[in-house]
Regions:
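AMP-forming adenylation/ATP pyrophosphatase catalytic core
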Residues: 1-181
Length: 181
């Protein structure tokens, strides 16, 4: 059964209980043999207000930093800082921001697309393994709109434009583990 499942083109995601506490999981191009069940999604919600500059998300081992820059500083830094950072027009962004885990039915108005798209469909289209999806936080504005999926997509809300006076930079990074040398 394992050989057949690994050689078949579809389905691209599956798991098989091998007995004795072992499982075999296929996630797109990866085959994993494990003695523990896949990690269940941890539910969390945090508020990120402007005076705060760093928020630690212990549930997923990451930290979110927030920096406000004037237009001139933003122009010097440039907008290309990778998928783990996002720039927003701070005057257009509805505060406070909320960082939370994914919920069933979540949608985002993706920059460059007309209309909205389900977060689950974006994860599937980008071939993000289901075991990694719970570690990706969603950043929502004060109206509840998802404005950024770190490492994945940014929404069209509060996009930086030529009339932007100040810019809010959000960055997601790995939490440094204490006690390691």
């Amino acid at each position: 059964a394992v050989r057949r499942g690994t050689l078949q083109e579809h389905p691209t995601v599956w798991s098989l209980d091998l007995g004795g506490g072992l499982i075999c999981v296929r996630q797109y191009d990866t085959i994993l043999f494990s003695s523990k069940p896949p990690q269940q999604q941890v539910s969390y919600t945090y508020r990120l207000s402007l005076p705060d500059s760093r928020l630690e998300l212990w549930e997923i081992g990451k930290a979110m930093t927030m920096t406000v820059l004037e237009r001139e500083s933003f122009a010097l830094q440039g907008e290309d800082s990778g998928k783990m950072s996002a720039w927003f027009d701070s005057d257009e962004l509805v505060l406070p921001l909320t960082i939370r885990s994914r919920l069933p039915g979540d949608t985002i108005r993706v920059m460059g697309l007309n209309g909205s798209k389900k977060v689950k469909d974006i994860f599937i289209d980008d071939k993000i393994p289901s075991s990694e999806r719970s570690a990706i936080p969603l950043v929502c504005d004060g109206s509840g709109n998802i404005v950024w999926i770190p490492g994945v997509r940014r929404s069209m809300h509060a996009a930086v434009g030529r009339h932007t006076a100040s810019v809010l930079l959000l960055t997601l990074e790995e939490l440094e583990k204490s006690g390691e040398t």
